[in-house]
Amino acid sequence: MSKGKIIVAMSGGVDSAVTAGLLMEDGYEVIGVNLRTWEYEAPACDTTKKSCCSPEDIRDARDVGISLKIPFYVIKMEKVFQEKVIDRFIEDYQHGKTPNPCVECNTFVKFGALFEKAKALGIDKIATGHYARIARNGERYAIANGIDVGKNQAYYLYGLSQENLKNVIFPLGEMTKPEVRQIARRMGLPVADKSESQEICFIPENDYRKFLEKKNVEFTPGFFKLKDGRIVGKHKGRENFTIGQRKGLGIAWKNPLYVISIEDDGSVILGEENETYNESFSVIDLNFQGLAPLNEGESLECRVQVRYRHIPIRCKITKMKEGLIVHPLEDVRGVTPGQSAVFYPLDSDYLLLGGIISKGSIQMRVAEPAISVLN
């Protein structure tokens, strides 16, 4: 007996292909869709084949559909992708932030817009090839870590709503990547041994600077400064830098220097290794999953992850009128505005909530006058 219809987002890779195959074996009527998010004549898709927006990947996804004998469609998502992902990506760099476009894509495109398309077709369920699981905490649903530590993608999925979480299936959450490839070979899927993309889909060769230049973004030049206000160099654009960066600064100093803050006036603040740790930071644009929304003034001890592959550390969070204040209870460095922070219970692996890192705790002392050491 059929379990009903389900839409599977198919990128052309092995993970989504196996997802479709497993759901078929489980009794679902699978409909495969590929999300067209980018204009294929654009350089971002002409210069690389390892991109989920490339024509090659659409053909691979279609070949999987033929192999599995399921319906397959390409859905146009260029407009929402431009507005919610690319425009925000550019805007964040223009404001001295380091964006995380994969989070925005999952929240607004792969799950937000795709769920709307599914509903319009009378289909409630969708599935993807993410390495994540669904957990319950009382009446609330939450993303939980996939068991493959090296592939776990929970960090990128904190933006899913309760309605999304009730109706999404992640068949790969209990599997490892080698197991997925083995299943693909058993199923005879044409992408069983296809290599993975490690790039942002619209950024060829991961060169975001070149992408910004092609979008005619004006870079903001300024000075390299120390925390005490001393000027130690010039740069051609704050957009070239991110928090924690050490290489490519071009500054000769007695000890290695790191980017610890990027200012609105174009100044890039540098510090030595012991100056890279954060005392507190704020998180905005919150989405609560396993935890019911906090009231202003409420506090909670939990764990925070401040970037992908960062091991969560203990912290105390306090709900403010706008977002949270986070006080780490263990050392953390390189907290970066524009990146996401996700929060876990102290003793479990499901997401309580997540949001965007707004502003670090670094306070810069301005020397009067600033002492220049430029040649």
UniProtKB/Swiss-Prot annotation:
| Keyword line | ATP-binding, Cytoplasm, Disulfide bond, Nucleotide-binding, RNA-binding, Transferase, tRNA processing, tRNA-binding
Which superkingdom is the protein from?
Answer: Bacteria
Instruction: Quote the record's binding site residues for ATP.
Output: 9-16, 35, 129
What does UniProt list as catalytic? 105 (nucleophile), 201 (cysteine persulfide intermediate)
- Disulphide-bridged cysteine pairs: 105-201
Task: List the GO terms this entry assigns under cellular component, sorted alphabetically.
Answer: cytoplasm
Name the job this protein performs: Catalyzes the 2-thiolation of uridine at the wobble position (U34) of tRNA, leading to the formation of s(2)U34.
Q: Which NCBIfam families match?
A: PRK00143.1, trmU
Name of this chain's protein: tRNA-specific 2-thiouridylase MnmA
